[in-house]
Curated annotation (Swiss-Prot):
Protein name: Adenylosuccinate synthetase
Keywords: Cytoplasm, GTP-binding, Ligase, Magnesium, Metal-binding, Nucleotide-binding, Purine biosynthesis
Pathway in which this enzyme or protein is active: Purine metabolism; AMP biosynthesis via de novo pathway; AMP from IMP: step 1/2
GO biological process annotation, one example: 'de novo' AMP biosynthetic process
Underlying gene: purA
GO CC terms: cytoplasm
Cofactor binding note of this UniProt entry: Binds 1 Mg(2+) ion per subunit.
InterPro entries in alphabetical order: Adenylosuccin_syn_GTP-bd, Adenylosuccin_syn_Lys_AS, Adenylosuccinate_synth_dom1, Adenylosuccinate_synth_dom2, Adenylosuccinate_synth_dom3, Adenylosuccinate_synthetase, P-loop_NTPase
UniProt organism field: Zymomonas mobilis subsp. mobilis (strain ATCC 31821 / ZM4 / CP4)
Amino-acid positions noted as binding substrate in the UniProt annotation, renumbered to this chain: T298, V299, T300, G301, R302, R303, R304
């Protein structure tokens, strides 16, 4: 059995939660390997909706779940999210959930700095969730971070706390903000430590043991390839590497553990927040896509921008993320359109591109070159086999495969877990 790594193939919000939940039923371990609580997952199981942003999707099904060292953790959000799920009768214990001891913490000073920067940015906002993800990663790279393991030694890390606070006080001074209250921060950390430490474990060792037992491991990515800090629409990106290769470093496993890479993509395209979006539709069609697809961010509640499927971006995502197969979601949202468009290139000035150039002004100026195909009137909602799909919907799927140079492995036709068409089992490689 192969391991499976799930990544978003667009700008996030592709429906990874449902697909991961569907796969988690057959996995032995589910691992988050990057990001923080800025990425929302919505699961619908037996008519019950679960919303997660930090915890791996496997917790809902009771699958062993691990938050890897590549994830930045807000301990207070962890507590609140866990309590909310427990109220929905989800069982979460140290036997079913582990947090890497080396995961960096998101502290209140990180989310505050995030907000200070966004407020100062004016009309040039990146569109951050203001949850401190970026500043926490900055401190990790700057070797200032307080990590999960440090919560067991708060009284012994005074010099490190002083260095961290001095750095942030210098930044806060530039924004005209008061210094960090050191005493309060220490007390807050001592208070929350008891919630986190029971789950703190050597995640790399657990995973190594599971691998030796030939367990099926499912790596759950957050955000999407086009939000990757290196390969995305910079600077309108997240603060971590979202591509499949990060599963190795962000979990403590070797590169060979990544296995089958399943990219999740909507049958159209959406984006939350600022940044280039060549196929964005500021018209009735875009509004219809948003209404039918219930396009609001799980974490922020912000309305998502909507547009036609972009095969250029997808082909680029497939290449840089090493995607083996695609899970196509929300096909049912396209039911009833007379015609559907697919972006096959970009025009920037007098030049046509078959990829998205890296310069941000070129990205903003890119105009889509469309191919138009006939739509379908029949409903695809709830379909669980190819025979239930309209012929024109199948034609649309096949055309996407040709354009992105990657096979469609799964098709999702509703938020319900079982409304999924399996073309190829990712766990079989």
């Amino acid at each position: 059995m192969a391991n499976v790594t799930v990544v978003g193939a667009q700008w996030g919000d592709e429906g990874k939660g449902k697909i991961v939940d569907w796969l988690a039923e057959r996995a032995d371990v589910v691992v988050r390997f990057q990001g923080g609580h800025n990425a929302g997952h919505t699961l619908v199981v037996n008519g019950v909706t679960y919303k997660l942003s930090l915890l791996p999707s496997g917790v809902v099904s009771g699958t062993l779940s691990i938050i890897g060292n590549g994830v930045v953790i807000d301990p207070w959000h962890f507590r609140d999210e866990m309590e909310r799920l427990r109220k929905q009768d989800v069982v979460i214990t140290p036997d079913t959930l582990a947090i890497a001891e080396t995961s960096p913490l998101i502290l209140p000073l990180h989310s505050e700095l995030d907000g200070f920067r966004e407020d100062r940015s004016g009309d040039k906002k990146i569109g951050t969730t203001r949850r401190g993800i970026g500043p926490a990663y900055e401190d990790k790279v700057g070797r200032r971070a307080i990590r999960v393991c440090d919560l067991a030694h708060i009284d012994e890390i005074g010099s490190r706390l002083d260095r961290l606070i001095a750095h942030h006080n210098a930044l806060r001074s530039g924004f005209g903000k008061p210094p960090v209250d050191r005493e309060k921060l220490v007390n807050d950390l001592k208070e929350i430590a008891g919630c986190i430490l029971p789950f703190a474990k050597p995640a790399w060792r657990i995973l190594a043991d599971e691998q030796k037992k030939n367990r099926r491991i499912l790596f759950e990515g957050a955000q999407g390839v086009m939000l990757d800090i290196d390969h995305g629409t910079y600077p309108y990106v997240t603060s971590s590497n979202t591509i499949a290769g990060s599963a190795a470093g962000g979990s403590g496993m070797g590169a060979s553990a990544v296995g089958f890479v399943l990219g999740i993509a909507k049958a159209y395209t959406t984006r939350v927040g600022a940044g280039p979006f060549p196929t964005e539709l500021d018209d009735e069609v875009g509004q219809t896509l948003g209404e039918r697809g219930h396009e609001f961010g799980t974490v922020t509640g912000r309305r998502r921008r909507c547009g036609w499927f972009d095969s250029v971006l997808m082909r680029q995502s497939v290449a840089v993320a090493g995607i083996t197969g695609i899970a196509l979601t929300k096909l049912d949202v396209l039911d009833g359109f007379d015609e559907i468009k697919i972006c096959t290139g970009y025009k920037i000035g007098d030049k046509v591109y078959d990829y998205l150039p890296p310069y941000y002004k070129d990205q903003a100026a890119a105009k889509p070159v469309y191919e138009t195909i006939e739509g379908w009137k029949e409903s695809t909602a709830g379909a669980r086999s190819w025979s239930e799909l309209p012929a024109q919907a199948i034609k649309y799927i096949r055309r996407i495969e040709e354009l992105i140079e990657c096979p469609i492995t799964l098709v999702s036709t509703s938020p319900e877990r079982e409304d999924t068409i399996l073309v190829k089992d990712p766990f079989l490689g």
